[in-house]
Swiss-Prot record:
Provenance organism: Rhodopseudomonas palustris (strain ATCC BAA-98 / CGA009)
InterPro entries reported for this sequence: Aldolase_TIM, PRAI_dom, RibuloseP-bd_barrel, TrpF_fam
Family stated for the protein in its record: Belongs to the TrpF family.
Protein name (Swiss-Prot/TrEMBL): N-(5'-phosphoribosyl)anthranilate isomerase
Membrane spanning residue stretches: none
Keyword tags: Amino-acid biosynthesis, Aromatic amino acid biosynthesis, Isomerase, Tryptophan biosynthesis
Gene: trpF
Catalytic activity annotation: N-(5-phospho-beta-D-ribosyl)anthranilate = 1-(2-carboxyphenylamino)-1-deoxy-D-ribulose 5-phosphate
Taxonomy of the source species: Bacteria, Pseudomonadati, Pseudomonadota, Alphaproteobacteria, Hyphomicrobiales
Superkingdom of origin organism: Bacteria
EC number assigned by the record: 5.3.1.24
C-alpha cells in the first residue's frame, strides 16, 4: 500500500492546488482560532470546492462543540474529521454515529505512558495520528514543528492505519516512516517558511520525498 500523505493547515488556493496536484491523499483545514492556519468556514468551503474529490478533505478541530461540528460538516462536507484535543473515546464514538464520517484521532506523544490510551481510541477511531505532545505553555496542541522520539512507536501494533506527524519535513520523512513503520505521514510546519505560510515548492518536495520513501 502506498504511503498516505496528508498536508495539513492549508490556507490558500495556491498552496492547496500545489498539494493536490502533487498527489496529497488528504488535505487538512484547521478550525482553531488560536492557530495561524485557522480558517473561517466560508473560506474553508471555497477551498473545499477547489479540491473537487481529488483528495480527501479533513476538518481538524480541537474539542469542538456540536454547533461548530454541525457548521463544518454542513458547509465544508469533509471526508474526515480529525480530533486534536482531549476528545474522549465516547465523544469520538458519538460523533461518528451522528455524522457518519470517519475520524482520525490525534494522540500526543512524549513518553511511553502516552500510549496507554491507544486501545480505547483504536476501538472507536478509523485512523490514529501520533503527534508530539506540546509544551504546557503552547498556544495550540499541534502544528508546532516539534518531533517526538519515533522509537516510542516501536512495538505499536494497531489493526487500523496510523500516521506519524510532528516536526517532519522532506529531509527526515523517509527516516520517520522507516522507524515508525507508519502507514502515513502528516506535515504542516515542515512545508512552511513561517508559521501558517506554506510554500508550494516545499509541499512538492515533501510529497516527492514521502513517495520515494
Ligand atoms: O496546525 C495547527 O495550527 C494546529 C492547531 C491546533 C491543533 C492541531 C494543529 N495542527 C496539527 C497538524 O497540522 C498536524 O496534524 C501535525 O501536528 C503537523 O505538525 P507539524 O508538521 O509539526 O506542524
Amino acid at each position: 500500500m502506498s504511503t498516505i500523505v496528508k498536508i495539513c493547515g492549508l490556507t490558500t488556493a495556491d498552496t492547496l492546488e500545489a498539494a493536490v496536484e502533487a498527489g496529497a491523499d488528504m488535505v487538512g483545514f484547521v478550525f482553531f482560532p488560536a492557530s495561524p492556519r485557522h480558517l473561517d468556514i466560508d473560506f474553508a468551503d471555497a477551498l473545499g470546492r477547489q479540491v473537487r474529490s481529488r483528495a480527501a478533505k479533513v476538518a481538524l478541530t480541537v474539542d469542538a462543540d456540536d454547533d461548530l461540528l454541525d457548521a463544518i460538516v454542513e458547509q465544508l462536507r469533509p471526508n474526515w474529521l480529525q480530533f486534536h484535543g482531549s476528545e474522549s473515546p465516547e465523544r469520538v464514538r458519538s460523533i461518528k454515529r451522528i455524522y457518519g464520517l470517519p475520524v482520525m484521532k490525534a494522540i500526543a506523544v512524549a513518553g511511553p505512558d502516552d500510549l496507554s490510551v491507544l486501545p480505547d481510541y483504536a476501538a472507536v477511531a478509523d485512523r490514529i495520528l501520533f503527534d508530539a505532545r506540546p509544551p504546557k505553555d503552547a498556544t495550540r496542541p499541534g502544528g508546532l514543528g516539534a518531533a517526538f522520539d519515533w522509537k516510542l512507536l516501536d512495538g505499536v501494533n494497531l489493526k487500523l492505519p496510523f500516521l506519524v506527524s510532528g516536526g517532519i519535513n522532506a529531509g527526515n520523512v523517509a527516516e520517520a516512516l522507516r522507524v515508525t513503520r507508519a502507514q502515513g505521514v502528516d506535515v504542516s510546519s515542515g512545508v512552511e517558511t513561517s508559521p501558517g505560510e506554506k510554500d508550494p515548492d516545499l509541499i512538492r518536495d515533501f510529497i516527492r520525498a514521502a513517495r520515494a520513501a
